[in-house]
Structures are given as C-alpha cells and as structure tokens.
C-alpha cells in the first residue's frame, strides 16, 4: 500500500493506494489524520465500497453487495475503479489536484477534481 498525504490551506488530505490498485480517500479534514479513528470491521473485512473517491453506475452491470438496508452501497463499475494517476498543479487562484481512475473491462476513465483556493480553507 502507498499513502499520499497532502496539506493545503490547513486541510489534511490522505489517499491510500491499495495493493489491488484501488485508491481510497481516507481523510479530508482540518484535523490531523489518525488511522484508528476510522478503522472498522467492515473496512477490515473486504474494503468493498469503503472510502471510494467516486461511484459510477452503468445501466446493465450487476452490483456486488446488493443492498444495505433500503439503499445500494456499491455501484458498478465504481467498485472496480483502479488508480491511474494523480496530478497536482497550481494556477493563479490556487491548487488543483486531479485523481484519474479507470475500469479496464469497460474502458471508462473517471477524473475526480479537488480545487483549493489560495487563502481559503474550504
């Protein structure tokens, strides 16, 4: 597993890239990251659907873990997304972080964008 720590405008962001290629958003807060605050039995068991950056639904694809009460908790192909790249740039208004993920069977790419404005902790 690889961990990416980012601090911007007093916000702490932690991404974990797991051995299976999935990227997880573990922390996004003004508080420091403490792994013990978030670990639970569900995450320890299979990680499926936990802390995903994005969920993607394509009609006709089956969902694993079907239901959790009255709601779906995992989307397809969202649960299969693998980490491809993280770009970290700065422009005249602040910092821009883009996380690219892909799903090999369908060929789709998902880009999640995190925009930070200079001097503003939001």
Question: Residue spans of the language-model regions?
Answer:
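Short, surface-exposed, low-complexity cationic segments
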Residues: 20-34
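Hydrophobic beta/alpha structural segments that scaffold and line small-molecule/cofactor pockets
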Residues: 13
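Extended, loop-rich substrate-binding clefts of extracytoplasmic carbohydrate-active enzymes
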Residues: 60-121
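A charge-rich, low-complexity, intrinsically flexible signal that marks solvent-exposed coils, linkers
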Residues: 38-52, 56, 61-63, 95-97, ...
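Conserved, mostly hydrophobic/aromatic
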Residues: 10
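Extreme N-terminal starter segment of soluble prokaryotic enzymes
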Residues: 2-4
